[in-house]
């Protein structure tokens, strides 16, 4: 499967706007997908998104600027839907049992070869995108993500890579 690639740069709100503008219809399709599987009313989803907006803002206000930029670029009337996308795992974990059928990451030493599978819905495969983010002259990020989501599986130009896995815990956590 070949994924489309887009490149964005600038300040967080500018990157978000470019992301939203380039992937507007894909973002709408991603919102529709999650709205169906969240198993909650739109009002409940948006209330949860408000909570996660404050958590995200407390952690890093620039992330909120990027999320708001995505909503503006994609012409999403309610930016809370973009917060819901960026909090999808947390919202899903409230009702959908998650466990052994989630993604797997692996690393081989000493070369530090890193890989991950993406065990999620086949309905999202055609929406996935390779996003290249030029953060600064010295920093570029390449990641596989879902439209409207500011961070997922990828690597930066300094050689730091990130995988995304769901970890099951015996108590809820709020924050990072």
Can you describe what each PLM-predicted range is?
Residues 1-176:
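N-terminal mature-domain region immediately after signal-peptide cleavage
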């Amino acid at each position: 499967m070949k994924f489309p690639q887009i490149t964005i740069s600038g300040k967080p709100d500018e990157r978000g706007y470019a992301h939203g503008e380039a992937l507007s219809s894909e973002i709408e399709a991603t919102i529709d997908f999650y709205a169906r599987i969240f198993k909650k009313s739109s009002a409940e989803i948006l209330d949860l998104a408000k909570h996660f907006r404050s958590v995200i803002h407390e952690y890093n206000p620039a992330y909120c600027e990027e999320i708001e930029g995505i909503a503006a670029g994609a012409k999403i009337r309610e930016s809370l839907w973009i917060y819901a996308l960026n909090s999808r795992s947390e919202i899903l974990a409230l009702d959908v049992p998650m466990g052994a059928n989630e993604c797997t990451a692996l690393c081989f030493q000493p070369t530090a070869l890193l890989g991950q599978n993406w065990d999620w819905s086949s309905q999202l495969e055609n929406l996935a995108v390779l996003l290249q983010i030029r953060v600064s002259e010295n920093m570029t990020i390449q990641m596989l993500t879902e439209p409207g989501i500011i961070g997922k599986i990828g690597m930066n130009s300094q050689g730091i890579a990130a995988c995304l896995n769901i970890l099951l815990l015996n108590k809820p956590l709020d924050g990072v």
